[in-house]
Structures are given as C-alpha cells and as structure tokens.
Amino acid sequence: MSPAIDIAIVGATGTVGAAIVEILEERDFPVGQLHLLASPASAGKSVSFKGRNLRVKSIEAFDFAQVRLVFFAAGQAVTRQYASQARAAGCMLVDLSGALPLQQAPRVVAEVNPQVLEKLEAPCQVTSPASQVVALALALAPLRPLVRWRHLGVTACLPVSSLGREGVAELARQTTELLNGRPPKPRFFDRQIAFNLLGRVGDSDTAGHTGLERRLVEESRQVLDAPELKISVTCLMAPVFFGDSLSLAVQASQAIDPSAVRAALERAPGLELIEPDDCPTVIGDAVGQDVAYVGRVRTGVDDACELDLWIASDNVRKGSALNAVQLAELLIKQGR
C-alpha cells in the first residue's frame, strides 16, 4: 500500500470532477486529505467521499502547497490561470482540459504509452487527452504490429456531456419542451440539439477546422508516437447525454487480415471486442464501464487495404476520469 497523499481536484463539481471523486474511492486510491475546488459560485456544496461529506472550496483562495497531486478537471481558462501556481508549489499535475502545451504536459493513455511518464521531470505534468483520443488510441495501439497506417479518417459523435452539465441540462430541457408540444428555445447551444445532429462542435478557423478537431489530430499523433500520420477528423454533436461514438477508417499500406485484427483487439487492455454480428452502443454497452467497446471490424467494400471500425466509450468515465486516475496511480508507483 502506497503512503497516503493529499490531493486537490479543480472542477470537482463538474461531470468529470465528480467522476474522479467516485473512482478514487472505488479504486481505494491512497488519499490523505482531499480538497475539492471549484468556482466561488459552487463553493459550499457538499460531496460524499468514503462516507464523509466534504465541503467544496473556492479555488481563488486555495494554497496548493497543501497538496502533492492536483487533477485539473475544469475548463482551459481555469487550468491556464492556476496550473502555474500548482507547479510552483511542487505539485504533480494531471490535466484533463488540454490547456497545457504538448511538450510540457505530454498526452498519455495508461494502456498505450505509459512509458512516457518515466521521462518526466519533477514536478510532473501530464495530460489525459480528449476522451475521443483515448478511445481511438485503445483501438489503434494493438494494431501497430499488423497494420502500417497511411491515413486515419475519424467521425466522432460527441454527447452533450462533453460540454459539461450545461449541455446535459440543455438537451433535457429541449427534449421536454418538444415532447410537450412546445418549440425549443436554444440557450446553451446556438440551435436545436434535441432530436438533431449538429455538424460542428465549436468555432471553425479560417481553414474550416474546429479547435477540438485539431486537438484530436495533435493528441492522437503524440499518443500513438506517429508525428507524421495523416488524420482527418470531423466532430459532430449528437443528441445523446453520455458516451462517445466513433467511426474509424484506417487506410493501410498493405492488405488487412480482419481475423488477425479481431484477435489483436480481443487481447488488448482497456478494450472489449463485440461479436461480428453485433454493434456496440453507448447506452447498451459503454456508459458506466471501464473499457471502450469496438465492433464492426471489416475491410473496405472494394479495398482490402482499408480497415473500418466502430467504437463506443464512456466519455466521462473511461475517456476522462478513469484514465486520469490511472495516470496518477502510475506516477505514484514510480515514486514521484
């Protein structure tokens, strides 16, 4: 048993922050004092942890010298504002916002590239990548001995919880209005999300790509250690509360053996292969689980060098909170 360490969770009242609290308890993480931090508006709320009710504190007055490990589960602006304070206090940082540069806080998926952690200088900074990258990396990493990638094509259907509690509340409100015969009035989203599919998540740059799409490309390349890999990404917002659904098309430089691919996926950690005659879904399979699900493994209709997959994963749990806690466990195991 590792010695107990004092921990802070920034963004503790959000969907991911709350999931981190739950997973720390479930995995019997060696927690000493747990400090739950949020904005002043959320300060004073109560969160249950190991049979105790912990009071949420305002991050504005918090002294990071009180803790050894900090999870940043808030937005990028909050991370940019407070990460330097935590690092100056000598804390290990596990970021989930993607605010820190790739070179300073490398993106790591626990089952894919944990060796990166061994090279970090103290105090360590590491980033748990976007939940969609976690799902993609879990499915792609086992295929490296079998498939020489030339290009990845990704269509990612995101749930409204990827934008936090506000997204969840907005979908619930719009759905209720429609089912009661009232036209929904968009507030959080710029148009109707209930019973609809939005073809863009966030603002586009001059080339037409969103910040999230660029993030997925950059983080996937780093996690897979494939800096030159060509990746095309389209992110959609789906009228789903929780769970990422991804369509992945891999263009290889040689013909692909689907049987060998299935065998590799079946052995892969953090992944569950669904039978060929079935298809994983976020509601029926992925949500609440500690693995990502992959199915519909097949080659292209008329191209033996194309591999197509369908992936379903819990964006809050497997894709975010669990990976962050696993990274912290690895750092502690290394004696950081």
Swiss-Prot record:
GO molecular function, one term: NAD binding
CDD domains documented for this protein: ASADH_C_USG1_like, ASADH_USG1_N
InterPro entries: NAD(P)-bd_dom_sf (IPR036291), Semialdehyde_DH_NAD-bd (IPR000534), Semialdhyde_DH_dimer_dom (IPR012280)
One protein family per Pfam: Semialdhyde_dh
Gene3D superfamilies tied to this protein: Dihydrodipicolinate Reductase, domain 2, NAD(P)-binding Rossmann-like Domain
Gene Ontology BP annotations: amino acid biosynthetic process
Domain of life assignment: Bacteria
Family classification: Belongs to the aspartate-semialdehyde dehydrogenase family.
UniProt name for this protein: USG-1 protein homolog
Native species: Azotobacter vinelandii
Gene: usg
